[in-house]
Regions:
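Sec-dependent signal peptide recognition
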Residues: 2-8
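Short, low-complexity N-terminal intrinsically disordered segments enriched in polar/charged residues
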Residues: 20-57, 61, 69, 79
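Short solvent-exposed beta->alpha transition segments
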Residues: 32-35, 49, 68-146
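Exposed beta-sheet edge and beta->alpha loop/turn motif
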Residues: 114-197
Length: 197
């Protein structure tokens, strides 16, 4: 009898203690185009939304060959506000006139993905319903990466998308507050600059 009680108790704890993340329903393209938010969005907003979603999908699937285009490689390091202790990145940028090279991004994608906080940006875009992105110019989400919590906001105006990332965990292992700005070139979002706050 005790065995059954402990089994039930363990199962009960397992279900109650697991994270209850709200599931964001992904709409098909057809469903999305039928929403009020999509119908009421301006053509410019639809274009910016489309580029933002393409960026997120490439980040999610880790399309290493496409990411240098988004980062506008070769990109000057001061425009990225990049002061890294990572020797692979530092050696590469010093050898490339202090620019982040295309080869570095493709050859060391996971390193760049985490070092440049693309993981936080990816999770932020993913966690916001598409209809909210279409209906609002400024949206926000809380993102957890490992043991670190971040409050992220996405501001979409004209042809610009800004990501404002604020650390909610007072821990030296967590990323510092920063702001990213991407500008649409009519086809994709291209990094304008990144600024540590």
């Amino acid at each position: 009898m005790k065995h059954y009680f402990y089994s039930f108790f363990t199962l009960f704890l397992l279900f109650n203690c697991s994270e209850n993340k709200p599931e964001i329903k992904k709409l098909t393209q057809q469903e999305l185009t039928e929403t009020t938010e999509f119908k009421e969005a301006s053509p410019e907003k639809k274009q910016l939304f489309s580029e933002l979603k393409a960026f997120q999908k490439d980040l999610q699937s880790k399309q290493a060959q496409k990411i240098p285009d988004y980062l506008d490689c070769p990109k000057r390091i001061e425009e990225l506000d990049l002061n890294t202790k990572n020797t692979a990145i530092r050696t590469d940028v010093e050898a490339n006139s202090f620019r982040l090279s295309t080869n570095l991004v493709t050859d060391n994608f996971d390193l760049i993905y985490n070092e440049l906080d693309l993981n936080i940006i990816n999770e932020a875009i993913k966690s916001i319903p598409e209809t909210d992105l279409l209906a609002n110019d400024n949206v926000s989400a809380n993102v957890k990466i490992g043991e670190c919590d971040y409050h992220t906001s996405i501001l979409m105006k004209n042809k610009e998308v800004e990501f404002d990332i604020k650390s909610a965990t007072p821990n030296s292992e967590c990323k510092k507050d920063q702001k990213w700005k991407f500008v649409s070139n009519g086809e994709i979002l291209v990094l304008d600059h990144r600024k540590m706050l």
